[in-house]
């Protein structure tokens, strides 16, 4: 389901990549039968280090997607990236799901599956190795991936926090 991709202009004329991760049909049982509605997990990113996710719920699929995109745009996080990959390896956690993110050299490509791939493509990561551990629920995988990306720090940021220069940190 994650192969669906659209680019749309934001109010700020900013191009964002929208990826639908999962669409779920849910039913509410009432006296007269079942009432169906839909939920959609959507990931939005600028392809340059900003990424967010949103869950939209509605009676129709397009409306659920629209609500998910709207929520994802409101809740975007800035991710620290290097030229070709991420600065260091990290494990993102959410619930019973864990996602292991490991930097890769140029030319490796995006080695990830399903929801993790959608998040990383929207964030603009092009070379990375990933492994999903624990729960493979799309909700948990998306949130664990974004948690891992939020933990990333560049060498400059770490040096600034420690009050040292970059050469002392990388040596």
Curated annotation (Swiss-Prot):
Record keyword Ribosomal protein present: yes
An MF annotation (GO) of this entry: structural constituent of ribosome
Source species, domain of life: Bacteria
Key word Ribosomal protein present: yes
Entry-linked PROSITE patterns: RIBOSOMAL_S5 (PS00585), S5_DSRBD (PS50881)
Protein family (similarity comment): Belongs to the universal ribosomal protein uS5 family.
The protein's role, per its UniProt record: With S4 and S12 plays an important role in translational accuracy.
Subunit structure, as described in the record: Part of the 30S ribosomal subunit. Contacts proteins S4 and S8.
Domain notes: The N-terminal domain interacts with the head of the 30S subunit; the C-terminal domain interacts with the body and contacts protein S4. The interaction surface between S4 and S5 is involved in control of translational fidelity.
Protein name: Small ribosomal subunit protein uS5
Organism of this sequence: Desulfotalea psychrophila (strain LSv54 / DSM 12343)
Gene: rpsE
